[in-house]
Amino acid sequence: WISAFFILVANSWMQHPVGAEMIDGRPRMTDIGAVLMNPLAWVTFSHVITASIQVAGGFLVGIAWYKLWRRRKDGIDKVVDGKVVVGESDKGARDKKDFQVWLKSLRLGAVVGLIGFAGVGASGHMQAQMMIHEQPMKMAAAEAACHDGTSFSVLTVGELGAQSCDKIHTIIEVPGVLSFLAHDNFNTPVKGIQTLVPEYEAKYGTNLPDNPLYGERAGQKIDYLPSLEVSYWGFRGMIGLGAVVVPFYLYALWVTRKKGVGTVPESKLLKNVAVWSILAPFFAIALGWIFTEMGRQPFVVVPNLEGDPAIRLYTAAAISPGVSGEEILFSLLTLGLLYGVLMVVEVYLLIKYVKAGVVAAMPELVQSHHEDESNDKSKRDVLEFAY
């Protein structure tokens, strides 16, 4: 968490620069305290941490559901008169303790996932309000909102990739929701693209500065509109994938309640939903970061509307002129290959450990009549390396 905080402090300064002054044409930090206490950094930190908490809860729900489902499929546990009858199996030490471990893990994961989602929603609301104030064009792009209004777009169709308000149409919207996100009321209009573009041009200019930083791009016209396609669908994907698993968490708590069945259904479909739902929060976070970074274009350092407008940097200045396209491609392919290999190894190890089950992590459960299996070191010690 400490590492994440300092990374987010740096990123938040690029989104909302504070504690710096322009000296000899360059921003120089003058107040480290202001940088560390940047309001955006703390809101972003809470948003990221609660999202990671939801990821952890969802992971636990998916694995625990699978293990309980497997016990039912293998005939170890049965449901009689609406109540679970917990059985035992010598294979893998799947006894009553094993059942309790996964049952409690399922319920704990569901609770943690719900707490994480609630935190994500609360911090996300605060972050959205700061974004609308500091980066109004980002929210306008996220809504594909061409005109000032109060409505939240549920579905906008057309050629978002064309970057033209003439080619997009909102067909489903919820009145007042966008105003609530921005101002905590349902009536205050939020500025749209056609209002914001002239404001940005008047404040920051219509062309890139005549500065060596921009190389051949110096003097080119600035497009203050981020990618509508990426911003619009990235914003909805982030929210949708984070929220779609919440009913499943609630259902997991319901079917395992004290007066309920006490275990998961035999449904293979629900088992598949549980396992694949592990990925939803991961992709939600990825889309959230894509939206965050793509939505601030054309800036790499977004100007602080209440600070020195000179402290800003366009993305065109962040391009290294001494690096060729071939070198960039090689770097991307190398990093992609490296992380791809790491992903394959991680997924393989995770599957191996999940299949090994409790007996691998808690060998003390393997006693007496499980003695033969406990001597199988390949199963008993598998989590020693995992940690």
Protein language model features and the residues they cover:
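Polytopic transmembrane helical bundles with strong interfacial aromatic enrichment
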Residues: W1-Y387
